[in-house]
Amino acid sequence: MISARWLYCLVLLLATESCRLFCQAASKSKENVMPRPHDVCDGVCKNNASPCFQSCPPNSEGNMKFACKAKRWHKVTETCHTLNAHSIFEEDKELYSVQSSESTIRTHMFNSGLKTITDTLMEKCPKDLSCVIRGIEKSPRIPGNIAVVVQLLHNISTTLTKGVDEEKMQSYSAMANHILNSKSISNWTFIQDRNSSCVLLQSINSFASNLFMKGHLINISHVFIHTLGTVVPRNSLGKNFTFSMRVNDTSDKVTGRILLTTEELQKVPSAFQVISIAFPTLGAILEASLLENMTVNGLVLSVILPKELKNISLIFEKIRKSGERKSQCVGWHSLESRWDRRACKMIQENSRQAICRCQPNKFFTSFSILMSPNTVESPVLTYITYIGLGISICSLIICLAIEALVWSQVTKTEISYLRHLCIANIAVTLLMADVWFIVASFLSGPIVHHNGCVTATFFVHFFYLSVFFWMLAKALLILYGILIVFHTLPKSCLVASLFTVGYGCPLVIAVITLAVTEPGKGYLRPEACWLNWDMTKALLAFVVPALAIVVVNLITVTLVIIKTQRAAVGSSMFQEVRAIVRICKNIAILTPLLGLTWGFGIATVVAGHSLAFHIIFSLLNALQVSPDAMIESEWRGC
């Protein structure tokens, strides 16, 4: 038995036509199931029990379907409705008294079941559509009635493709306002056609797109839907639409603004009309099914524009105000029935509001912001990061200063020279990586400082990779000291090889990553100056080489330790073996520390947004330099 939650997610992911076919199939399969007796869908049940159907309360038609989950009956769908052709036209009851509501209303699928009501509406009040408003507003907001109104709005939007004026829009908005009430949100869960909320949004946008204005501002305001429209003259200096609405009866008002810049308006050769609609509760109804752990945190703003306008700016005040939770600007994909991050980019964000730049088109006309419920930032994390980076930078500077002081004394042999060459370059690359990391953190984001973000991210990527590749170079030194064949290589050749490994390989990887992902705007993360993960997985260009080097180094150290046990004290190889063992110790300490550090770094991106992972990563990142920073062996000699 599929649970109600998973059935909900499955249907919502489907496009409108697919949802209709699914619901039709579900309706047919329901007819083949022998329903249990009415009024027994309560209490304990068996997990493999067949669905239970219960009759609706008096004065309503339909039924309620229950499924057994965790050995208890839970309501899955409800088709109970009081609205029908008999009640919706309250003043003409006799006209439809002989018609059965079952023959005129089908709440479980979008078909021609409400054609009679729609046709009668067009006959009775085609001028303003007002003859059904009283009947709808008096009806309870139960799931079946919501489905009836959604179907009616859908039919009206497909019937009236022209000649929509302010009066019709006023009545249409009043019908939608009734089912968008905050008190009805929980009942949307039980509507049999889970795609109803998508159809509602699409129907409202479609109907509004046919609205014709007579040169004056249109302002149709209801509690849960607000429509603004105006005619923009040619060469206008810019327009903005501001909404201020309550999400529920007890909350404060939340604002949303749509901004059209002068530059964009110049692209339209003649006067045109702009229509914008705001919904305070529709975000709670529309499920962000393809973006896990995300909730709508602002008004849903729809905008109908001429096709020449490609960019708009939107300012969303946050419903839940938090500086520790990142938001994402999104557009509603009308074909795929889901929120899509590709439609918008974040320009600026603080604890109270988010500014987005979006690209409306025939698929994207509605926009909002999503908020992750997981905390990914905190003042503690910020302090630890900057204090840790300060400690790291100071340690690295001390390390390089000590290396400079003792350089002539500790580089007398070839292998010692090469060893300290690696140590110095590890310190330099880690120092540069930390500096560029700080530069990247001070940039406000990839939208405001895109070129600066690209530059900072490139160098952070390059220098952190260089740290790992110089660690690999130190491992290669072990092989140089153990394998006789390498003794024939001149010192200059070895130095060139080390620099090729330490800087050449990271440079190639960093350049290829930038060249492949940046043209499609997939190089940077939307909210920070670092490699993208969600869209292009560019972060793998750092993760894969780094962890591969960690594994190779650990294997190399293990093999060399086994081999060096054969060298006897006083033998000709003994002194070189002692130097090699020092390198092994150094690598054996640094490699796990570096690997552990970036293992936690990966966990912060892939395995969730736990604050503990971020704090551990910041601490290890600050301390990973300390074994080399002490440089104990420099004072002991080689």
Swiss-Prot record:
An individual GO BP term: adenylate cyclase-activating G protein-coupled receptor signaling pathway
Residue stretches making up the GAIN-B domain: 233-377
Transmembrane segments: 387-407, 423-443, 466-486, 494-514, 542-562, 587-607, 611-631
Stretches of the chain found on the membrane's Extracellular side: 26-386, 444-465, 515-541, 608-610
Membrane topology label: Multi-pass membrane protein
Gene3D superfamilies: 2.60.220.50, Rhodopsin 7-helix transmembrane proteins
An MF annotation (GO) of this entry: G protein-coupled receptor activity
Subcellular location: Membrane
Signal peptide range: 1-25
Keyword rRNA processing included in the entry's annotation: no
UniProt keywords, alphabetically: Disulfide bond, Glycoprotein, Membrane, Signal, Transmembrane, Transmembrane helix
GO cellular component, one term: membrane
Biological function: Orphan receptor.
Miscellaneous comment as given in the Swiss-Prot or TrEMBL entry: Most adhesion GPCRs undergo autoproteolysis at the GPS domain. ADGRF2 is not autoproteolyzed at the GPS motif because of the lack of a consensus catalytic triad sequence within GPS region of the GAIN-B domain.
Family: Belongs to the G-protein coupled receptor 2 family. Adhesion G-protein coupled receptor (ADGR) subfamily.
Protein name per Swiss-Prot or TrEMBL: Adhesion G-protein coupled receptor F2
Organism the protein comes from: Rattus norvegicus (Rat)
Gene responsible for this protein: Adgrf2
